[in-house]
């Protein structure tokens, strides 16, 4: 009986130990003094959970992101879907701003930050020339 229970518990626990996937993307504004940040997103396929953080260059702390929603659109049959993903930036338990990213396949077409208090929008471009990894983040 004890062996059967242990086997059953092990079978239940194995799917729950699935790996969380991590993606690191680097962004910056245009201009002489660009604003740069690293976006880390996390996804757990078993729990169907998604979240993330942003860390601005020169900052030691990451700002948590709360997944708001994702829209998908098929632009052409047989091509990757276009996704528009929105996250809320959370500071002291309140929504401080909103990040919206439009992507298709591996291409990121736009990234916009909107300040919740002022409504000011800031457009960012993907920094493809910056090396990034899940272990070290963006190497500015």
Residue ranges of model-derived segments:
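Acidic, glycine-rich flexible loop segments
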Residues: 87-108
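Positively charged n-region of N-terminal signal peptides that target proteins for export
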Residues: 1-4
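N-terminal signal peptide c-region/cleavage motif recognized by signal peptidases
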Residues: 13-17
């Amino acid at each position: 009986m004890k062996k059967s229970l242990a086997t059953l518990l092990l079978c239940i626990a194995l799917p729950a130990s699935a790996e969380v996937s991590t993606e690191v993307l680097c962004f910056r504004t245009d201009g002489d003094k660009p604003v740069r940040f690293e976006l880390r997103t996390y996804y757990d396929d078993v729990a169907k959970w998604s979240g993330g953080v942003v860390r601005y260059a020169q900052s030691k702390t990451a700002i948590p992101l709360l997944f708001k929603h994702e829209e998908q659109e098929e632009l052409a049959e047989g091509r990757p879907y276009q996704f528009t993903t929105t996250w809320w930036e959370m500071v002291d338990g309140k929504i401080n701003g909103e990040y919206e990213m439009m992507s298709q396949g591996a291409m990121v077409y736009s990234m916009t930050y909107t300040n919740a208090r002022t409504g000011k929008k800031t457009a960012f471009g993907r920094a493809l020339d910056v090396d990034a990894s899940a272990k070290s983040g963006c190497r500015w």
